[in-house]
Amino acid sequence: MAVAMDNAILENILRQVRPLIGQGKVADYIPALATVDGSRLGIAICTVDGQLFQAGDAQERFSIQSISKVLSLVVAMRHYSEEEIWQRVGKDPSGSPFNSLVQLEMEQGIPRNPFINAGALVVCDMLQGRLSAPRQRMLEVVRGLSGVSDISYDTVVARSEFEHSARNAAIAWLMKSFGNFHHDVTTVLQNYFHYCALKMSCVELARTFVFLANQGKAIHIDEPVVTPMQARQINALMATSGMYQNAGEFAWRVGLPAKSGVGGGIVAIVPHEMAIAVWSPELDDAGNSLAGIAVLEQLTKQLGRSVY
C-alpha cells in the first residue's frame, strides 16, 4: 500500500467529511427508513489477508438495501449458467433512475443490468425457481461470508417496503407481460424486500464482500464463493452500474467498483487488496450516500488507489 493503514487514518477522514452531514437527505419514501439518524457515519476495511480497520459507527447495523443486489446475483451465479442469467438481464448501465419503467418498456422487458430494481427482481424471480427457501438461503450465504451468525432481516423495513411497493409491482408485472417474469409477483416481491431489509454493519459488509477483492475467495471459507472470472465480472458490473445513474461521476471521483443502497451504505472493492464499507444515511439526488462518497474519495486519494 502507498500508505500504511490504521484506524487513525480512517478517523481523520471521517473528521474531514463530517461537515457534509446535513447537506443530504435520508430516504423518506420508505417510512421505516425515514426515522434513521442522519448524523451516523462509519467506515470499515477488510483486507484480503483478514486485517480489519474501522472508525466511527462501523459496528452499527443498518438496512443495506440495494447492496443486497450483488449478493442475490452471487447466489444466482451458483445456481444458473451464464447463458441462463444473461439472456434475461443485461450488463449495461441504464442512465435512468433505478426504478424506471420507461426504459424497461422500450427494451421489451429486459432490464439493463442486475443492479437496478427491474434487474434485481428478475434475479429474485430466478432464485424462486431454483431454491426451496430463497430467504433462508440468503441468510445462510451472508452469515457464512461474514462469519456472523445473527445477521437477519429487519421485518419492519421489509413490511414498510411491501406496503409501498406499487412501482416495483408495476415493474414486475410489466416484465411478466413480456414473458421475463415467471413466478408469483407477490412472493418474489416479498423475497426482494427482505433481501433489501438485511441489517448489517460496515464491519460485517467489509468482511462479507472481501471475496470480490480476493478473486472470488472468502478469507475464512475453503470453498470459493464465485470463480475468479465471475468476481471480475461482478466488479465490472459494479463499476459501470453500481451507483445508479451517477456511476460515471463516482468513477471520476473515486475510481473503484462499488454498490450503494438507499440505506446510506456503499461497498467498494480494491481488487487484490481490500473491501471497503461506508455508511452515512443522508443521500444525494441520485440516492447515493453523500458523505459516504466523500469518505471514499478521500480514502482513495490518500491510498493512491484506482482501477483506472
From Swiss-Prot:
Listed Gene3D superfamilies: DD-peptidase/beta-lactamase superfamily
Subunit: Homotetramer.
Positions of substrate binding: 66, 117, 161, 168, 192, 244, 262
Protein family: Belongs to the glutaminase family.
Keyword Translocase: no
Enzyme category, top tier: hydrolase
Protein name (record): Glutaminase 2
Keyword Transport: no
Keywords on record: Hydrolase
Reactions it catalyzes: L-glutamine + H2O = L-glutamate + NH4(+)
Superkingdom classification of source: Bacteria
Enzyme Commission numbers on file: 3.5.1.2
